[in-house]
Amino acid sequence: LKNIRFLEAAGDDPIIVHQHSIGGDWAEGMMIYDAITQCQCHIVFVMHGAACSMGSIIPQAADTRIIMPNCLFMIHDGSTNLDGTHKQVQSAAQLEEKMRDQMLDIYASVCLNGHYFQKEQATDKSVRQYIINRMNEKEDWWLNAREAVAFGFTDAVLGDEGYDNIDSIRDIINNEGE
C-alpha cells in the first residue's frame, strides 16, 4: 500500500506489480485491491508462479493483467475458522456470505470481457452462476494461463502479440497517453 502511494506521488509513470501469491487474508487483500483501484497511475499486474485465492482477486483491480505462461490461477470460496458464541458464529457466517458475493461481483465483472463469455453472450448473472458451478464441482477451480485469459481473469499471457515482454507493455501504455 505504501509503495503504491509512494510511486503514485513520484509521477504518472505506469506502475508494474509482480506477484506470486497462493492467497491470504480477505481484509488485507481487499486493502491492496482498493489501493490499486484508487491509484491514478496505470497499473500493470504480472502474475508469476501462482495466483490463487486472494492472490487471484487482487490482480483484478489492475488496469492491465498479465500472466506468465506457466502461472497457475485458482479461485475458490476460501477457508474460514469460526470460534465463539452461537451468535458470533452466525454473524461470522453472514459476513462470509457477503465476502463471497463481493468476490463473485469482482470475478463476474472481469469475466464478462473474456472470450469464453463474450462468445456465449453471457450476462452478469449467468457468469456468476457459471463461476459458482465450477467452484461447486471441485471446490478449487484451477486454470492454466491460457484458460485464465479465455475466461477473462487476465488480459494476456506474457509472450502474446503486443505483450512480448515487460518493456513492450510499458511502451503500449506510454503510447496510450500521447
Predicted regions and their residues:
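N-terminal organellar transit peptides
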Residues: 1-56, 60-178
